[in-house]
């Protein structure tokens, strides 16, 4: 390790280009990973925020909440389960505007009611308000409505379909579902809006959400239970998008490592005479291997840390229109994978070093 470090200090110009390349490639991989997570969060953030809950749906919904309907009979059957506390949830895409004549804004209503336990509270911004505190025709909006549209607490927004005015009472953090910002309303508010276009409408939750660990065998044959991950995977477009972007991220990581392997190989060719001298003075191949791998590890580690740090520092300055979300788990996985694959690709040059003949190289007839 000491020999590897001393060589890097003695001839830094040889390693600066490779170091810069590692920093750039690592930055690209981490940045793309952040965008992948950010796009995923714009689809599933609120379901993720709710945590490890169980969702009771009708079997014909195929696990998609907006396609499900819980009937009064279903509700009575669920109530018979011992210790069953739940919250009802319905999800509805809609549009709102600040005034009758202003531009329409996409919104997804999360309409809720509660049995005993209130478990569908969003992450609130600057308030302890809960969903159960909502009065009729009040709404809690995602904070992006404030940041992007200038809407403030106390303002009103107009539901474009029912023409109902909703008073903004608070904002929630990262409240998104299906590429849309969320507006949290009570079941009474939702029922009132629906009855303006359909007077016969009666509130029916699309899903019953509970902390209780249950299975589909505990329910009637026309009901099923899913967990958070299954609900998120069933959001239209989420799974295909997420798998595609993650595949691109890992392909970029492998391609980056291969590029680094080529640079390490070129660097090895430039040092063949040096390796010949080392062999001539008695250094074994295992010792040379240790020096090379130590050098690869040092270079990769420094580059990865700097690239990761650069991407992390840049993330807070990205505009809201660029969804980026970095996690410690992903950053660690990428960093370890990047270092290991870089060392593996760079280690291929050891085959060339092993073939070095000290007599030929020192005599000037080597490659």
Regions found by a protein language model. Give the residues of each.
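N-terminal Sec/SRP start-transfer signal
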Residues: 1-29, 293, 366-367
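The feature marks short, hydrophobic/small-residue-biased sequence motifs that occur predominantly
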Residues: 73, 88-133, 184
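Mid-to-C-terminal secondary-structure elements
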Residues: 143-183
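Membrane-proximal extracellular/periplasmic loop immediately following the first transmembrane helix
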Residues: 45-96, 106-112
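Peri-transmembrane interface segments
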Residues: 217-273, 277-278, 289-293, 297
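Alpha-helical transmembrane segments
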Residues: 14, 27-54
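Short helix-loop junctions at transmembrane helix boundaries
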Residues: 290-291, 297-364
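Small-residue transmembrane helix packing/gating motifs
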Residues: 88-92, 167-212
């Amino acid at each position: 390790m000491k020999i590897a470090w001393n060589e890097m200090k003695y001839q830094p110009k040889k390693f600066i280009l490779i170091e810069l390349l590692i920093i750039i490639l690592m930055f690209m991989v981490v940045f793309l990973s952040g965008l992948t997570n950010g796009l995923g969060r714009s689809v599933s953030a609120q379901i993720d925020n709710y945590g490890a809950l169980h969702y009771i749906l009708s079997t014909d919904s195929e696990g998609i909440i907006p396609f499900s309907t819980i009937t009064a009979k279903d509700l009575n059957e669920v109530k018979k389960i011992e210790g069953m506390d739940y919250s009802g949830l319905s999800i509805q895409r809609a549009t709102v505007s600040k005034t009758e004549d202003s531009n329409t804004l996409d919104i997804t209503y999360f309409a809720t009611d509660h049995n005993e336990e209130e478990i569908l509270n969003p992450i609130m911004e600057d308030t302890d308000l809960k969903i159960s505190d909502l009065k009729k025709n009040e709404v809690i909006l995602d904070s992006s409505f404030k940041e992007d549209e200038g809407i403030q607490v106390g303002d009103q927004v107009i539901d474009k379909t029912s023409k109902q005015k909703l008073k903004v009472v608070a904002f929630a953090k990262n409240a998104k579902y299906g590429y849309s910002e969320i507006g949290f309303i009570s079941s009474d508010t939702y029922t009132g809006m629906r009855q303006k276009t359909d007077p016969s409408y009666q509130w029916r939750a699309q899903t019953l959400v509970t902390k209780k660990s249950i299975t589909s065998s505990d329910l009637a044959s026309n009901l099923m239970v899913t967990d958070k991950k299954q609900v998120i995977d069933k959001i239209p477009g989420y799974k295909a998008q997420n798998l595609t972007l993650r595949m691109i991220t890992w392909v970029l990581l492998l391609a980056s490592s291969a590029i680094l392997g080529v640079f390490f190989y070129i660097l090895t060719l430039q040092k063949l005479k040096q390796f010949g001298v080392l062999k001539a003075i008695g250094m074994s191949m295992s010792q040379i291997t240790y020096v090379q791998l130590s050098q690869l590890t040092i270079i990769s580690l420094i580059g990865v840390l700097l690239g990761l740090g650069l991407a992390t520092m840049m993330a807070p300055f990205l505009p809201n229109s660029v969804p980026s979300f970095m996690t410690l788990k992903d950053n660690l996985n990428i960093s370890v994978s990047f270092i290991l694959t870089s060392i593996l690709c760079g280690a291929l040059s050891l085959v060339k070093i092993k073939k070095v003949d000290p007599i030929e190289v020192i005599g000037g007839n080597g490659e």
